[in-house]
């Protein structure tokens, strides 16, 4: 049995926090992208935070999720931050160059 993948979005002032839960793969990421993008475009935050603390598994789709939200943050004039990454996931993100796009 696989854990349900979902996002819990919290907005405080101009800070947008997307708390991700479950496994991130090519099957589960698209609905998360759509929900995050719709809420961010509606609220136009100055800071966009992706919290990976609730993520149990992530394939390269997680990198794609970050890259797409970086582009969205650029459109909004917002800063992108990543938090809650495991040491292994953080290293993979760094190898992929995500530390050039987002603050960890």
Predicted features along the sequence, with ranges:
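Short beta-strand/loop segment at the start of cytosolic alpha/beta domains
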Residues: 1-19
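Amphipathic alpha-helical interaction surfaces in cytosolic regulatory modules
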Residues: 23-101
């Amino acid at each position: 049995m696989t854990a349900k993948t979902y996002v819990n979005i919290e907005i405080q002032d101009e800070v947008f926090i997307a708390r991700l839960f479950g496994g991130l793969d090519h099957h589960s990421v698209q609905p998360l992208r759509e929900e995050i993008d719709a809420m961010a475009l509606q609220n136009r935050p100055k800071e966009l935070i992706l919290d990976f603390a609730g993520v149990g598994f992530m394939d390269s789709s997680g990198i794609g999720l970050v890259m797409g939200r970086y582009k969205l943050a650029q459109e909004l004039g917002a800063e992108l931050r990543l938090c809650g990454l495991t040491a292994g996931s953080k290293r993979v993100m760094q190898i992929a160059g995500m530390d050039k796009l987002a603050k960890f």
